[in-house]
Amino acid sequence: MNIFHGDAVPFAPADVNSFTGPARTKRLALDDVGVPVHVYRVEFEEGGRTNWHTHTGPQWLFIVDGRVRVQKWGEPAQEVSVGDAVVIHAGEKHWHGAAPGGRGAHIAVNVSATTDWLEPVSETDYKKK
């Protein structure tokens, strides 16, 4: 068993090549458990969101603060809140970020996955219901 204290790893500003608006990330899982698992806390201020992207493996989002908007390519955006979970399957083009008018945060768990970052989410698509 290993314990990683949340304050031991600082937040970093989100990569401007992969995010639009104010956001920050913190890697939470720092241990090799024999399976490539990446765990992050991602916090979005109002207007903050990822670019469209895909993963080569599954991703789980666990909403821990505020409201988060998620969208799969070709489908309407949906809003989720604290206590909700989202499962994104390998290869699904999607984005996630703060719901318009507020802030939000999630824990992201990526298993055996790399990320292919794509184009930014337009302001129109971000605000569209």
Outline where the language-model segments fall.
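Ligand-binding loop in jelly-roll beta-barrel domains
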Residues: 33, 69, 76-77, 81-82, ...
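Short proline/glycine- and basic residue-enriched helix-capping loop/turn segments at helix->loop/beta transitions
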Residues: 43
